[in-house]
């Protein structure tokens, strides 16, 4: 993110496709709604239940600099999306918007199971699970994010599943 010029940073897999026109406008508008810019914005990925987990997400440079990371580096291939979803849900700043960023994953029959997938799928999950379960560490980061938010703003879901472009 340090080499990026923009203030909104996306974390995503390399097997995605943007299926919503003007998705970038919708993301920017969501960030504009929150002057403190502390939120995690995501859309439907075609695999997870809508609104459940931010598998591919956007966050602000301000939020990244507060916690000191785009995502925890020690997670490897798995569970950092769970970590980020849990953190932003805890502060009421997990924002699900009507964009479809399709995850073209082998597990859904959308791509061949190649060497790259094999490397990620065969990676040890136990360490990532253990890291994800480190509530004390996550709570510390949640508190850091809370210090940066304007408590007069409350999150509300402006989008409903039936409006979502699936």
Question: Where do the PLM segments sit?
Answer:
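Short, conserved alpha-helix that lines the donor NDP-sugar binding/gating region
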Residues: 1-2, 85
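Active-site acidic short loop of glycosyltransferases
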Residues: 4-7, 36
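Conserved nucleotide-sugar donor-binding
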Residues: 5-6, 55-68
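Short beta-strand-to-loop acidic/aromatic patch adjacent to the donor-nucleotide binding site
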Residues: 6-17
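A residue-level structural signature of the nucleotidyltransferase/glycosyltransferase Rossmann-like core
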Residues: 9, 56, 93-94
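Short glycine/serine/threonine-enriched helix-capping/active-site loop
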Residues: 11, 38-44, 97-106
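Conserved donor NDP-sugar-binding/catalytic core segment of glycosyltransferases
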Residues: 16-56, 62
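C-terminal catalytic/acceptor-binding lobe
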Residues: 78, 82-166
């Amino acid at each position: 993110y340090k080499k990026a010029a923009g203030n909104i940073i996306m974390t995503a897999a390399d097997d995605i496709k943007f299926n919503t026109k003007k998705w970038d406008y919708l993301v920017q508008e969501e960030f504009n709604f929150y002057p403190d810019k502390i939120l995690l914005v995501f859309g439907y990925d075609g695999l997870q239940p809508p609104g459940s987990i931010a598998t591919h997400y956007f966050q602000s440079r301000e939020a990244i600099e507060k916690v000191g990371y785009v995502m925890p580096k020690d997670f490897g291939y798995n569970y950092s999306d769970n970590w980020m979803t849990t953190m932003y849900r805890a502060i009421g700043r997990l924002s699900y918007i009507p964009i479809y960023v399709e995850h073209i994953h082998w597990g859904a029959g959308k791509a061949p199971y190649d060497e790259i997938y094999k490397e990620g799928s065969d990676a040890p999950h136990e360490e990532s699970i253990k890291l994800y379960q480190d509530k004390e560490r996550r709570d510390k980061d949640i508190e850091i994010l809370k210090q940066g938010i304007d408590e007069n703003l409350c999150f509300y879901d402006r989008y409903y599943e039936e409006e979502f472009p699936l």
